[in-house]
């Protein structure tokens, strides 16, 4: 197990899934409902391309996640996924094209999530105990 490599793959997964989520949000505010994509005469091709790119980013994120699971204990790896919730909230609220707003309660929630991620990932990992056969 290579912890550093596992963390890098997990963070790459977080980054890709966050970009995918923001891209889908941007696209879906510019497109009709998905069931109307084939019947509407003019669908925004850029927004549709961004949706497809976001789906590809999700697939890459999953591959990075699988690679991370090879090198990290599940409890540590899974906690790193929480960073995506914080990242998406912060970017959506700070970038004008998303028209989202900051709130004290949401920001406090993000801070608590990040504190939890830091707490889980800064304490030393215990080696698994081997059980002897009876």
UniProtKB/Swiss-Prot annotation:
What are the subcellular locations of this protein?
Cell inner membrane
Spans traversing the lipid bilayer: 6-26, 46-66, 78-98, 102-122
Residue ranges in the Cytoplasmic topological domain are 1-5, 67-77, 123-134
Q: Which GO terms describe its molecular function?
A: carbohydrate derivative transmembrane transporter activity
The alphabetized UniProt keywords are: Cell inner membrane, Cell membrane, Lipid A biosynthesis, Lipid biosynthesis, Lipid metabolism, Lipopolysaccharide biosynthesis, Membrane, Transmembrane, Transmembrane helix, Transport
- Origin: domain of life: Bacteria
Q: In which pathway does it act?
A: Bacterial outer membrane biogenesis; lipopolysaccharide biosynthesis
**Residues in compartment: Periplasmic:** 27-45, 99-101
Q: Which GO terms describe its cellular component?
A: plasma membrane
The membrane topology term of the UniProt record is: Multi-pass membrane protein
Enumerate the InterPro entries for this protein. Answer: Flippase_ArnF, Small_drug/metabolite_transptr
Transmembrane helix is among the record's keywords: yes
**GO BP, sorted A to Z:** lipid A biosynthetic process; lipopolysaccharide biosynthetic process
Q: How does it assemble?
A: Heterodimer of ArnE and ArnF.
What NCBIfam families does the annotation carry?
PRK02971.1-2
* Record function comment: Translocates 4-amino-4-deoxy-L-arabinose-phosphoundecaprenol (alpha-L-Ara4N-phosphoundecaprenol) from the cytoplasmic to the periplasmic side of the inner membrane.
**UniProt similarity note:** Belongs to the ArnF family.
What protein am I looking at? Probable 4-amino-4-deoxy-L-arabinose-phosphoundecaprenol flippase subunit ArnF
What is the species listed in this Swiss-Prot or TrEMBL entry?
Answer: Pseudomonas fluorescens (strain Pf0-1)
């Amino acid at each position: 197990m290579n912890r550093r490599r596992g963390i890098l793959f997990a963070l790459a997964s977080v980054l890709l899934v966050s970009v995918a989520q923001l891209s889908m949000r941007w696209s879906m505010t510019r497109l009709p409902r998905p069931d109307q994509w084939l019947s509407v005469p003019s669908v925004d091709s850029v927004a549709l391309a961004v949706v497809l790119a976001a789906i590809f980013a999700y697939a890459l994120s999953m591959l990075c996640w699988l690679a991370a699971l090879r090198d990290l204990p599940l409890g540590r790896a899974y906690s790193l996924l929480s960073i995506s919730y914080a990242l998406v909230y912060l970017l959506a609220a700070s970038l004008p094209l998303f028209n989202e707003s900051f709130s004290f309660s949401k920001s406090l929630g993000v801070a608590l999530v990040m504190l939890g991620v830091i707490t889980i990932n800064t304490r030393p990992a215990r080696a698994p105990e081997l059980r002897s056969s009876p």
